[in-house]
Amino acid sequence: MNVDVVARLRSTFRTGRTRCLEWRRDQLNALEAMLLNHREHWQIALGQDLGKSPFEATMTEIYPVITELKHTRRNLKKWHKDQPVRTPLQFFPGRSWVRYDPLGVVVIISPWNYPLQLQLSPLIGALAAGNCVIIKPSEISSAVEQLFAELAPHYFDPEAVAVVTGPADAATALIDARPDHVFFTGSTRTGTAVAERAARQLVPVTLELGGKSPTYVHHDVDLKATARRITWGKFINAGQTCVAPDHIYAHQDVAAALAEEIANAVRESFGARPEKSEDFGRMIHTGAVDRVGAMIPPVGSDNVICGGQVDREDRYVAPTVLYPVAESDPAMSEEIFGPVLPILPVSGPQDAAQRMLTRDTPLALYIFATDTSVRNYIMAEVPSGGVSIGIPVAHVGSPHLPFGGKGASGQGKYHGKWSRDTFTHQRAVLSKPLKPETMGVIYPPIHGAVKSVLDRALSPVGDKKRRAPGS
């Protein structure tokens, strides 16, 4: 069946109808209508899957998509028109340009943690580029999956946009059907499997993965403001965010005070009993509760500054701050992807950078420092997919910035015009008229004068004699 859907959409693509800017704009308008007309239904579904409040569902899932959509729609014509470039002198008279051609049939495999935003944001780019698209929502966030599958045929062109539901095997079958591109968001382990599967078919992939995104806090910052911002970025969606601050390296002079300030910020945000707060979500399933709960020392342990409670039946893990933490502790063994925040004291930015470099390249890097030289040092020393200074997560929400990983945290970029680049083939075109004929000098037989001109063109500037390195 999945082979059939790829073939069916490819037939649609070959008619050329998706290349029309009007069609692309119509699909973007349809996406906007589907979101806004059913805003309450999306809020309910997100509440069922992840315990999100209506406000959090709107702020983290609906609003970012609408922002991205409006930005893309506003720039649609400009981004996708031919781009003239310079033509080398030897090809004059002539013209050169870059065409942004749609790829064809694109498969988007989306995750469960932001099940609406992370399937619709890439969909915006794929549709704007003129592709036919197959969306495979995560079966784990089943309420959103079912709602999307129900609504999509009533809004999108059904011959160009398809939704495939079901277990992970359905995604595997889609890859085997040889689409023109696969866009995957999820774990590094699954992303590796997707890349390997796609490589067998020579299908290009974009991988948006994750990792342990670190934070460095220097001794010169406002600790209260820093703590409040980190608390927001860490505990939104119960910590199940691919760019959440995974752990903190705090300067030893302020580490203990920072831990207390974050604990205070947790209480200010979610009250004395976060399980009663509508602003604090739930883990996706009991397996996630068990995995994250195993990272937490027993309640009452000296390094549990706040939280530590777990209710498996309610899928609840309390917002938890751990200090001090060692590199060998359970919370540092893998990406946490939950509401547990370890804080490790360090002697300074050099110590923090060296520790960060012992791990895979993260999707995000966060720096809290007033001293510009400290910020620049960390950014220069530590590679990452993206960086936010003075606030976590925020860079992901800008359609004017590329979003993507590096190394183990992913490959490829999207958002804004970077989605255009991901979902199009940048096609080189050079056009030269047959008259006047200016190419005769390079046609065989080659005359000595032409060879002399070429030799002079390749002569080193300012030194007519070539010298071997070191001579």
Walk through the language-model features, giving the residues of each:
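N-terminal Rossmann-like NAD(P)+-binding subdomain of aldehyde/semialdehyde dehydrogenases
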Residues: 1-97, 470
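Short, well-ordered beta-strand elements within core beta-sheets of diverse protein domains
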Residues: 11-17, 108, 216-217, 247-250, ...
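Structural signal for hydrophobic packing residues in well-ordered secondary-structure cores
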Residues: 13, 17, 32-35, 39, ...
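Conserved C-terminal structural/oligomerization subdomain of aldehyde/semialdehyde dehydrogenase
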Residues: 19-20, 316-471
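Residue-level signal for inorganic ion chemistry
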Residues: 24, 69, 130, 161, ...
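Short loop/edge segments at beta-strand edges and connector loops
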Residues: 80, 165, 186, 306-308
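Rossmann-like NAD(P) dinucleotide-binding subdomain of oxidoreductase/dehydrogenase enzymes
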Residues: 88-225, 261, 346, 470-471
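ALDH superfamily catalytic-core signature
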Residues: 189-326, 350, 389, 451-452, ...
